[in-house]
């Protein structure tokens, strides 16, 4: 197993178990995490820590499962599923919408693109997923 594959697996296992410290250890000190659908960007360790703690407070039962994962010495891609129950506000989701969805479960499929640092950590990641589909599951958008 490539070291970066192991790193991504460790990262997603940590978020699924609410292990903030292990999750943070996967990222370079100046890492950038961009959630494209939410237009949310966390830059640097403080923003990463604040962001993940806020996420886990809002969705404490977050579960991520890997569908496919490919890495090399510099880049990686991961297709995943995520599920959870919304318990509060999430960065990128207006509070009035979050309030309508509290207590509701969701699941989604998405993908993350990675760039790794010279010391073997995540330098940059960009997450892509179906925002409209999730909002439909949460009952705030009509479903087809």
Predicted regions located by residue number:
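C-terminal and inter-domain tail/linker signature
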Residues: 1-144
């Amino acid at each position: 197993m490539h070291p970066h594959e192991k790193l991504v697996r460790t990262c997603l296992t940590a978020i699924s178990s609410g292990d903030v410290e292990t999750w943070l250890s996967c990222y370079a000190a100046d890492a950038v995490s961009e959630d494209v659908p939410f237009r949310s960007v966390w830059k640097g360790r403080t923003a990463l820590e604040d962001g993940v703690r806020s996420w886990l407070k809002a969705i404490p039962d977050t579960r991520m499962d890997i569908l496919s994962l490919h890495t090399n010495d510099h880049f990686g891609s991961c297709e995943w599923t995520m599920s959870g129950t919304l318990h509060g506000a999430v960065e990128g989701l207006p509070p009035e919408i979050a309030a309508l969805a509290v207590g509701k479960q969701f699941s989604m499929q998405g993908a993350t693109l990675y760039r790794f640092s010279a010391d073997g950590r995540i330098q940059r990641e960009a997450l892509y997923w179906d925002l409209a589909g999730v909002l439909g599951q949460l009952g705030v958008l009509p479903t087809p």
